[in-house]
Amino acid sequence: MSAVTGRFAPSPSGRLHLGNLACSLLAWLSARSQGGRIVLRIEDLDAERCPRKYADALEEDLRWLGLVWDEGGSSGGPNGPYYQSECADIYTRSYKQLEAQGLVYPCFCSRAQLHAASAPHTSDGNVIYPGTCRGLTAEQIAEKRKKKAPAYRLMVPDEDITFTDGCMGPHTENLLRDCGDFYLRRADGVFAYQLAVVVDDARMGVTEVVRGADLLSSTARQLYLYRLLGLKAPQFAHCPLLLAPDGRRLSKRDGDQSLENLRAKYTAQEIVGRLAFAYGLQPEPAPRTPESLIPDFSWDKVPKQDICLPEGLF
């Protein structure tokens, strides 16, 4: 296996938009510039929201752009399954490891209750859990189970987690104050993102995770999980988010910025070149292939702040 293994990890709840694409391009360039490989994992934990047709469309879009991967997705490979919806048994084993350490507890709080409590929020917008159910007795748990199935949270210590991000530089978060006890499993049995990505990145041999800056606050929680599960953590690089010209964050609801619509207006090389320009990898928005950008790639060139797309670039 190459020294560096990066990954694409799209959630197929809709078509790719420019923000997804930018992260995929940077992940691909970072790995390839180090002579590394790319794994494609489909993050369809919530299978009802992520029909397979969207996963197939994501693969086709990535191929069209020239962002070819080495294993995963429908291509398969030695470290499958590559669809999270097929990995419940794998996640269960890791979940039981955490249970055996006495760190998992049931939580009966609803989302509405948490928001009504005016608890502080993490930088990614989630409520920092105030620990309401952390100290429930066995009798209290049994009584609450009669009315509602619980979700399950991981208990975290009052501890600083420090790491150096490949794009953003040194970063520190306190697990208790900045993150709080976090979900491992929903009440309907679906495993949570934080656990699934740690287990998957480890078993797929991923050594470098490139993703959007909106997930920077997940890193401390994930590093803690790597430690508890005895797994080697990858390096992380969080790239700045793309914003619409009016400053709004791009989402899958922005149809004009979906790759499905952009393909009708631009060639693959034009899209790649304009993104490379937006992220500081070339001085003008000239058409480029991903391969041609490999010698130009450096995290030192990538801005640290979110990027507002210039009017008329797309």
What is each PLM-predicted segment?
Residues 82-97, 121-127, 150-158, 278-293:
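Short secondary-structure transition/capping segments
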Residues 65-73, 103, 129-142, 265:
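Short, basic, helix/turn surface patches
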Residues 112-251, 258-262, 311-314:
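Active-site cores that bind ATP or allylic diphosphates and position pyrophosphate for catalysis
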Residues 96-100, 202, 263, 276:
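Alpha-helix boundary recognition
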Residues 46-56, 244-246, 295-303:
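Short, mixed-charge aromatic SLiMs
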Residues 1-118, 122, 213-214, 218-231, ...:
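N-terminal Rossmann-like or analogous alpha/beta NTP/dinucleotide-binding catalytic cores
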Residues 55, 88, 111-114, 126, ...:
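Alpha-helix initiation and N-capping motif
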Residues 1-15, 33, 38, 65, ...:
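Non-catalytic terminal extensions that flank enzyme cores
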